[in-house]
């Protein structure tokens, strides 16, 4: 699929109070589903549609997200170590073609404050997709963007009615 020329901004800074037992040691986007973090699943959805440029707005325990991505290649591919040379080489792999900016947007920042802090990562009038780092949905990104472009609006919102919690 052709890559869509845009960035995805993902909010990943909330406390995750409803998942307190999981979020004592990590932020909610790093809670695993099927052995991979929620954040990874969200990024894979966009990547399936050719969108591979991400800005992650880090907050609560953002260092966990930074550590995950800074070690991502090592955990997802074969490596060769030359111990006496203190070198590591990564073998050919099928790693995702992602560019990931991990931005510390403050632990207590609200949504608007997080967006303000990443302003320098987005060019004027550059289209972006914006999503929360704790929601995985079956959305056809290409169709959503085509719908948005067809209607010529500044913002298109995708929403759903969540099922009851109890």
Locate each region found by the language model.
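Unchanged
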Residues: 1-166
């Amino acid at each position: 699929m052709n890559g869509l020329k845009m960035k995805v901004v993902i909010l990943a800074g909330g406390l995750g109070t409803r998942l307190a037992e999981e979020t004592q040691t990590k932020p909610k986007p790093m809670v695993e589903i099927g052995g991979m973090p929620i954040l990874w699943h969200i990024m894979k959805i966009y990547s399936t549609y050719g969108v591979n440029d991400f800005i992650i707005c880090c907050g609560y325990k953002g260092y966990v997200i930074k550590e995950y991505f800074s070690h991502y290649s090592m955990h997802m591919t074969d490596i060769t170590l030359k111990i006496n040379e203190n070198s590591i080489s990564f073998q050919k792999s099928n790693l995702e073609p992602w560019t990931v900016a991990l931005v510390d947007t403050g632990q207590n920042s609200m949504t608007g404050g997080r967006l303000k802090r990443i302003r320098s990562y987005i060019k004027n009038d550059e289209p972006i997709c914006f999503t929360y780092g704790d929601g995985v949905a079956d959305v056809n990104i290409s169709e959503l963007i085509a719908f948005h472009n067809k209607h010529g609006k500044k913002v298109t919102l995708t929403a759903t009615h969540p099922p009851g919690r109890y």
